[in-house]
Amino acid sequence: MNRFPINHCRVCGKTVVYRLPDDGDTKPRAVCTVCHTVHYENPLNVVGTIPTWGEDGSKILLCKRNIEPRWGKWTLPAGFMELNETTAEGAARETVEEAGAQFEMQGLFTLMNVAKVGQVHLFYRAKLLSDNFDPGSETIEARLFTEAEIPWDEIAFRTVRETLKLYFEDRQTAKFGFHVVDIE
């Protein structure tokens, strides 16, 4: 079950109970005790980019977080997808909000299943058009790093660390694939 359980019906406001719905579902769901509405708890999508700089894509733009969790740690520009936007639109929006970067979107690079916390992380490759950045309020600093310069011990999230490792592996062959990773 969700670590933030549903307590009240979104339709009528009455109390819900977790049980198997009458429709044959095999998982306990939040079911309203009055109007019998079934409430489903679904994963959240986190979307972002791997912004690269240079003809060879040897530098990566990272943002130092100015928010919790993991304040002061480095991450790729990313955040929760909003309603009414595609994954690519959300990734682009987050990159502008967090880094103030100008870039060209490229292909989807990683899909990370983080089932333990009910999230799916998607990262797109992006080619920076400028090395001037205007970080937003969620970012202390936006900076370019080569692979050797990346502060690996200061990376905020495992999904970001794994995405960066896969990027640099693919970069060596100049063939960028699409990677699906399950994070335990």
Model-identified regions with their sequence ranges:
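Short connector loops at helix/strand junctions that flank enzyme active sites
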Residues: 27, 42-46, 69-71, 76, ...
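Conserved Nudix-box catalytic region and its N-terminal flanking loop in Nudix hydrolases
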Residues: 42, 53-97
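A broadly conserved sequence feature marking short terminus-proximal activation segments
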Residues: 1-7, 49, 168, 179-184
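Small-residue-enriched segments and motifs
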Residues: 47-49, 58, 103-106
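A generic fold-level signal
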Residues: 4, 44, 55, 69, ...
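Conserved hydrophobic/aromatic beta-strand scaffold that supports enzyme active sites
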Residues: 8-11, 29, 50, 62, ...
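Unchanged
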Residues: 81-166, 170, 174-176, 183-184
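Acidic, metal-coordinating catalytic segment for phosphate/diphosphate chemistry
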Residues: 2-49
